[in-house]
Amino acid sequence: MASNKRYFSSSSSMLPWLGIAAVLVLLDQITKITITRLFVYGESHAVTSFFNLVLVYNKGAAFSFLASETGWQRYFFTIMGIGAAIFIIYLLKKHAGQRLFCWALALILGGAIGNVIDRVLYGHVIDFLDVHIGGWHWPAFNIADSAICIGAVLFIYDELRRVGK
């Protein structure tokens, strides 16, 4: 699951990783609060020819998966997010010295907590980053989603690197 290379002297050094996750949560929440104060729901402003800022709500998961359900998904994804956060904290404690693995976990943790906060407070996740090129349009996302995706890529890279040794 994680490479065996250690960069810190003790397994109790998970605090830097929790700090990274906390910074991501703050950045995610500050950007969401800012967008909700500056935009009304559905409002969009072009920043470049391929990037807009927009205010939309997602009651589902990634790519609005299950968004049209009756409301049970709010609780399901909240519980899943909290469970994932607890498991990630356990992994950070166990593998605190494994730098790349812990970067991946810290990014995923920060993103998961950022989106759980939205679900608990609002019943949906606030999305505001909108990328489109030609006829291709990516679903709106946020800082938390970006952190989760980058963390997942780092996790896969770390696993491939470890297996390749």
From Swiss-Prot:
Pfam families: Peptidase_A8 (PF01252)
Entry GO terms, CC: plasma membrane
Metabolic or biological pathway: Protein modification; lipoprotein biosynthesis (signal peptide cleavage)
Location(s), subcellular: Cell inner membrane
Any GO MF annotation of the entry: aspartic-type endopeptidase activity
Membrane-topology descriptor: Multi-pass membrane protein
Residue ranges crossing the lipid bilayer per the database entry: 7-27, 46-66, 72-92, 100-120, 136-156
Positions of the catalytic residues: 127, 145
InterPro entries, A to Z: Peptidase_A8
GO BP term (any one): proteolysis
Enzyme category, top tier: hydrolase
Enzyme Commission code: 3.4.23.36
Reactions it catalyzes: Release of signal peptides from bacterial membrane prolipoproteins. Hydrolyzes -Xaa-Yaa-Zaa-|-(S,diacylglyceryl)Cys-, in which Xaa is hydrophobic (preferably Leu), and Yaa (Ala or Ser) and Zaa (Gly or Ala) have small, neutral side chains
Keywords: Aspartyl protease, Cell inner membrane, Cell membrane, Hydrolase, Membrane, Protease, Transmembrane, Transmembrane helix
Family from the record: Belongs to the peptidase A8 family.
Stated role: This protein specifically catalyzes the removal of signal peptides from prolipoproteins.
Record's protein name: Lipoprotein signal peptidase
Organism: Janthinobacterium sp. (strain Marseille)
